[in-house]
């Protein structure tokens, strides 16, 4: 059974919890900005296809305490990234934090990117290309005061952009609002 985190706009967490429960999610835990839950890959696919409240579904990869950027690098370098995606895929690392004591989230992003690329180079002999605008794979790093969590984005584009229209009006609404 895999662990996931569904991101949603603040204030919709309880509704998202009920929506995920109706899809078959287990071990739900509501938090600010989203819901932690467990399930199989079928549930992940269903959540991506059927959720009207989530903006992204993230797949939990690893979590550990940290004191410096080097600890975060070591956590990311320990993961077997080639098992999760192919070296031919482009990638991007996104870092968010709450009460993080580190000075630069951009530096954390760079260190995680280096760890992923170093892991690929050591195990496959080459590294994935970085694409900031439209990557195939998004690695999400979430930092709290003393914990780092790594996720892979299973959604691609934000889910509120489903059915995104080429012709739009001046003030379109997000589809999940």
Protein language model features and the residues they cover:
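Conserved SAM-binding loop and adjacent beta-strand
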Residues: 165-177
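Accessory substrate-recognition/RNA-binding modules or partner subunits associated with SAM-dependent
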Residues: 2-137, 145, 154-168
């Amino acid at each position: 059974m895999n662990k996931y985190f569904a991101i949603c706009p603040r204030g919709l967490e309880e509704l998202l919890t009920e929506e995920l429960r109706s899809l078959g999610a287990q071990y739900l835990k509501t938090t600010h900005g989203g819901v932690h839950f467990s399930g199989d890959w079928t549930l992940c696919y269903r959540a991506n296809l059927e959720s009207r409240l989530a903006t992204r579904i993230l797949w939990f990869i690893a979590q550990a305490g940290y004191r410096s950027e080097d600890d975060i690098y070591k956590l990311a370098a320990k993961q077997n990234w080639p098992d999760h995606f192919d070296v031919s895929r482009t990638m991007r690392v996104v870092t968010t934090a709450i009460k993080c004591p580190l000075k630069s989230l951009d530096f954390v992003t760079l260190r995680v990117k280096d760890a992923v690329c170093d892991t690929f180079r050591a195990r496959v002999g080459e590294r994935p290309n970085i694409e900031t605008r439209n990557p195939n794979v998004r690695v999400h790093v979430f930092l709290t005061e003393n914990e780092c969590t790594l996720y892979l984005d299973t959604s691609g584009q934000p889910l509120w952009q489903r059915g995104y229209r080429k012709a739009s009006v001046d003030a379109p609404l997000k589809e999940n609002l």
